[in-house]
């Protein structure tokens, strides 16, 4: 049976002219299978099905290179004091007792189902997921990622996957100071599992799943682990993501242990290269460090929302871009709303730069599309052009919360939301229509997530000093009025 040829229409289409995004009025996109055949107006050929989305913006799907694959704990840490005091960071006594898994294997996979659904719902079509290792016994494993790969194929999300591996873990001493626990053998074993996963799953599900090397963060790596990672990356030509330059603790630890900066240490192993993507790049030792990033071709993944919540910011998006550094985007935290990250990223950049000239909204939009594609070495993603993969999103326009209409991107940047995405096609497959991710029961997914989040909160008590009652670890935004309110279940029992 032949593959149907599908045509999409809308009042606006973001095309690509070979150099830049361009806007088509009353535009059309035609694709067959997973490949785009036409972008413009007045397609002359035959089409099996036309879908007219009316007053909407058809554009390329967003690329999220630090995509939340977790039940995000930010809602617990927000305005809750030191993370070591609430059991998010491992306590020394928890480490000595022996860490354990917060979730079962089935629950781990459910986390990804919930998170991947959120990504698709918000217009993200390519994701490189991230989860927290604080809730794990030690990193991630091959078998669970075989399940994540199958889930990607089921939901239709394009993913870059691999089990996270690490040789160290940060923990808290009783006085609140941070220290490192090392397990070199576990780190190297994890890398072997990651290499095996890459060889077995790179290109799986008709190319929807690609492999990647995803060590946890630079301060949890040892020289031996980075040296071997570099060798594997070179052998496999694999994308590598490594969190670095993101905290003062990391910068100081790397300087103390390795007698160099984070970026210099990576560069010494050849890990600053065009196949390397680096969240977050907040801290560096000077302009020469930025030039090092530009010269090596490594990409920086900008995650503005998660850092702004903690009072920190990239300084600045425009300055990094002016240096010639390729910038991609990541959501990193909940919600998986790329529009919110673009909007806040623009505002933060302008505050940092002191004007409205160095960074434009199109620069952020490019980072979430073309920049992400460049970071992955994919000139067939992040754009709607003949020959590109049919990763297409549709955002409604004219919604009441968007205000009076002037320009599709400007209205979405100023007042749009992730759930303004009403349809998504990934590799030509319809994965969401009318805001509904196909095959997903949102209410059931939310019910199960709420139950699992309860388990996550209780696990904090195991990791905290003295194993206190879990509810004593978290503060509500407003003090409870009485003891009944403080002790009542967080969620009411469902009514039928």
Q: Each predicted region: which residue ranges?
A:
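N-terminal metal-binding scaffold of metallo-dependent hydrolase/deaminase domains
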Residues: 1-45, 54-58
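C-terminal cap of metal-dependent C-N hydrolases
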Residues: 15-17, 390-446
């Amino acid at each position: 049976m032949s593959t149907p040829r599908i045509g999409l229409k809308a009042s606006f289409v973001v095309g690509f002219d070979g150099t830049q995004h361009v806007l088509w009025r009353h535009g059309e996109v035609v694709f067959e299978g997973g490949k785009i055949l036409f972008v413009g107006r007045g397609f002359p050929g035959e089409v099996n099905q036309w879908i007219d989305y009316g007053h909407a913006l058809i554009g390329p799907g967003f690329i999220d290179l630090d995509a939340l694959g977790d039940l995000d704990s930010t809602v617990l840490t927000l305005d809750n004091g030191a993370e070591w005091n609430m059991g998010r960071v491992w306590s020394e006594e928890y480490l000595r007792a022996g860490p354990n898994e917060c979730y079962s294997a089935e629950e781990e996979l459910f986390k990804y189902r919930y998170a991947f659904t959120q990504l698709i719902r918000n217009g993200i079509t390519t994701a490189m997921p991230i989860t927290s290792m604080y809730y794990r016994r030690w990193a991630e494993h091959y078998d669970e990622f075989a399940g994540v790969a199958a889930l990607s194929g089921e939901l239709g999300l394009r993913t870059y996957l691999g089990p996270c591996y690490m040789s160290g873990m940060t923990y808290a001493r009783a006085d609140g100071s941070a220290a490192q626990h090392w397990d070199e053998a576990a780190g190297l074993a994890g890398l072997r599992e990651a290499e095996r996963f890459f060889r077995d799953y790179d290109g799986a599900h008709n190319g929807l799943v690609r492999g990647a090397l995803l060590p946890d963060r630079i301060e949890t790596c040892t020289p031996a682990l980075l040296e071997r990672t570099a060798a594997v990356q070179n052998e496999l030509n694999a994308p590598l993501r490594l969190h670095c330059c993101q905290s003062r603790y990391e910068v100081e630890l790397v300087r103390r242990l390795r007698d160099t900066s984070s970026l210099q240490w990576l560069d010494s192993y050849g890990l600053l290269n065009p196949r390397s993507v680096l969240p977050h790049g907040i801290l560096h030792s000077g302009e020469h460090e930025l030039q090092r990033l530009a010269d090596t071709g490594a990409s920086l993944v900008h995650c503005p929302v998660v850092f702004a919540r903690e009072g920190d910011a990239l300084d600045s998006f425009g300055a990094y871009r002016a240096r010639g550094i390729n910038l991609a985007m990541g959501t990193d935290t909940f919600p998986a709303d790329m529009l919110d990250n673009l909007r806040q990223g623009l505002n933060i950049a302008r505050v940092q730069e002191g004007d409205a000239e160095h960074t434009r909204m199109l620069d952020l939009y490019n980072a979430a599309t073309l920049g992400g594609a460049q970071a992955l070495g994919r000139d067939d993603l992040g754009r709607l052009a003949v020959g590109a993969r049919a990763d297409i999103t549709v955002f409604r326009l004219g919604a009441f919360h968007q205000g009076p209409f002037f320009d599709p991107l400007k209205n979405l940047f100023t007042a749009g939301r992730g759930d303004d995405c009403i349809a998504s096609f990934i590799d030509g497959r319809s994965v969401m229509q009318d805001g509904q991710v196909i095959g997903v029961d949102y209410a059931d997914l939310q019910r199960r997530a709420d139950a699992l989040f309860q388990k996550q909160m209780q696990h904090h008590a195991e990791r905290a000093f003295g194993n206190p009652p879990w509810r004593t670890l978290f503060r509500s935004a407003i003090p409870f009025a009485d003891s009944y309110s403080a002790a009542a279940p967080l969620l009411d029992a469902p009514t039928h």
